[in-house]
């Protein structure tokens, strides 16, 4: 299992005014990356999910990989991953993303309050977040890493619609300017804290800006390495 975490985090790293009143992280890209209106957003996400096919997956889901571009570009693709959660009941969801806006040293773990979207609040699993932070000095809470970051925010409406009648909490983790051993540090921490009620979401767009055939080649190589547990 530890190899899976290492591969997924390595994959993520290859892509490459304050709003914390009352410990609520306000939406940064509502109305831009996805609809800012509650009803419109719910309808769009529901349509994406309705058009996605659920695969016949054997065994327990440990993690999903999802893109984080605007819904116009990647919403339907993201829905295919989230569709696989149908029938599951994860209580704790760890979401890992790169940092697109804030340069910082370390791995920032958001450990208090809630994230807000037009669909409502998503609570932070503070106990789990602090357990992760306690594992290594590379784990910190750097608020600026999360202030404008879209890569975690855009995944939340899918969770809110998939799990709209269920109680779940999240642990947002954003990677800064990683050192070579950060992949191992995070993988080891995840291995220690995750249980059968925990899902890992890797928010990553894979290849960018390539012609279609080249993008398929690169992304197939990446997914093939994951399937083979090839950490090299």
Residue ranges and their predicted role:
Residues 4-13:
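Sec-dependent N-terminal signal peptides
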Residues 20-232:
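Active-site histidine-anchored catalytic micro-motif
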């Amino acid at each position: 299992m530890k190899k899976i975490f290492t591969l997924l985090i390595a994959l993520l790293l290859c892509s490459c005014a304050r709003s914390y009143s009352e410990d609520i992280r306000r939406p940064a890209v509502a109305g831009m990356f996805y609809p800012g209106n509650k009803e419109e957003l719910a309808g769009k996400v529901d349509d994406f999910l309705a058009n996605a096919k659920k695969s016949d997956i054997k065994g327990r889901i440990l993690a999903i990989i999802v893109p984080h571009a605007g819904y116009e570009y990647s919403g339907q693709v993201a829905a295919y991953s989230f569709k696989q959660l149908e029938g599951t009941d994860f209580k704790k969801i760890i979401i890992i993303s790169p940092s697109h806006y804030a340069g910082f040293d370390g791995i920032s773990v958001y450990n208090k309050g809630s994230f807000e979207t037009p669909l409502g609040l998503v609570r932070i699993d503070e106990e789990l977040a602090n357990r992760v932070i306690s594992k290594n000095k590379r784990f910190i809470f750097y608020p600026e890493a999360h202030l404008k970051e879209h890569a975690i925010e855009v995944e939340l409406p899918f969770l809110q619609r998939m799990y709209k009648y269920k109680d779940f909490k999240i642990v947002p983790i954003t990677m800064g300017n990683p050192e070579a051993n950060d992949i191992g540090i995070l993988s080891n921490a995840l291995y220690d804290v995750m249980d059968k009620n925990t899902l890992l979401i890797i928010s990553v767009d894979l290849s960018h800006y390539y012609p279609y055939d080249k993008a398929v080649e690169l992304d197939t190589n990446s997914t093939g390495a994951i399937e083979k547990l090839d950490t090299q």
